[in-house]
């Protein structure tokens, strides 16, 4: 068995355990597990680099992403078009280093392992999708018009 096949089998096992543990808890606990605040925005797109900002609950995270791999637009496109029961991984590159992502959707919930949360977290998919779209639109508006958007962080 080749290395890629083994990695996929391990990922499938891991996600099976994660989704089973989510399914096994009571509805109240599921609501608690998906109750996070989340935001995303593009801070800048420069020559060869994209700068993005994430907030999960009270933790803020900034990334500089190289154009040598998938970028912010790929994250937005993939995040907002994830089908039910679909899982995907991708990597953002920095020099040096990389940021690995895992997105797994089941029905109306998404499980995310991000560079800032290796243990993963759950969100209601529509909430996540709306925050990603909003961050993309505000970021583009800010960069190309220099307009301050109401409610935007300083």
Give the label of every model feature segment.
Residues 67-110:
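Compact, well-ordered interaction domains used in eukaryotic information-processing assemblies
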Residues 2-3, 14, 30-47, 53-56, ...:
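Long protein-protein interaction modules used by eukaryotic assembly/scaffold proteins
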């Amino acid at each position: 068995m080749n290395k890629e096949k083994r990695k996929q089998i391990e990922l499938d096992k891991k996600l099976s355990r994660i989704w089973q543990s989510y399914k096994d808890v009571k509805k109240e606990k599921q609501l608690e597990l998906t109750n996070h605040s989340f935001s995303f925005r593009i801070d800048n797109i420069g020559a060869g680099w994209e700068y993005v900002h994430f907030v999960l609950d009270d933790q803020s995270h900034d990334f500089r992403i190289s154009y040598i791999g998938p970028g912010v637009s790929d994250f937005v496109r993939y995040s907002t078009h994830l089908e039910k029961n679909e899982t995907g991984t991708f990597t953002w590159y920095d020099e040096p280093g990389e940021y690995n992502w895992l997105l797994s959707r089941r029905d109306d919930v998404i499980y995310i392992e991000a560079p800032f949360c290796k243990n993963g977290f759950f969100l209601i998919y529509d909430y996540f999708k709306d925050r990603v779209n909003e961050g993309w639109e505000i970021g583009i508006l800010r960069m190309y018009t220099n307009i301050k958007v109401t409610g935007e962080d300083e």
